[in-house]
Amino acid sequence: MVKVALLASERVSLIRQKGIYRKDKYNTMSINEIQDEVIEEFQDFEDWLDKYQLLIDMGNDQEPLPESEKTDNNLIDGCQSRVWLVCDKDGDILRFRAESDALIVKGIVALLIRVLSGHTAKEILDADLYFIPRIGLTEHLSPTRSNGLTSMVKQIKMYAIAFSAQANNQ
């Protein structure tokens, strides 16, 4: 198992070197372009242990939230693990930050943020998150983690609804 994890980490390094997994380029990519890239990355791995390791590495690559933001208000309901989600608005653009106390869940929320952060509320609300079934994520999660994934997506979309309504009232 250690060898498998090492191989997955090496592949993540190769993915980053090829320029596929670069946070700074997502500002210019559409949600669908990012989803297609995620699908391509996950297709590089045949074994789900490697895919889990990729998720863990993605989660560990995220900046941790300050303790001051790990509040009940930022906690996502419906997740077995503790997941905090923060949304910042920059003009019309929504930027998400998150953290979890569970490694795989931290990776899942990092993946959602990668796809949805940096886009407008309308783009987020209109997004069909087809990458989730295409990479096989839901079928390889326990029912409780699958419910948590649904709750994370719901919370991100709720932020988009709230900011969209706020913009319409101004």
Please give the residue ranges for each predicted region:
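Short, Lys/Arg-enriched N-terminal segments with co-localized hydrophobic residues
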Residues: Q17-T28
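Glycine-rich phosphate/pyrophosphate-binding loops
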Residues: G118-I135
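Alpha-helical support elements that line or immediately flank enzyme active sites
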Residues: V109-H119
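N-terminal intrinsically disordered, cationic/polar leader segments
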Residues: I31-I39, Q43-R82, K89-D90, I132-S151, ...
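A short interface-forming secondary-structure element
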Residues: S100-D101
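Hydrophobic residues embedded in beta-strands of well-ordered beta-sheets
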Residues: D92-L94
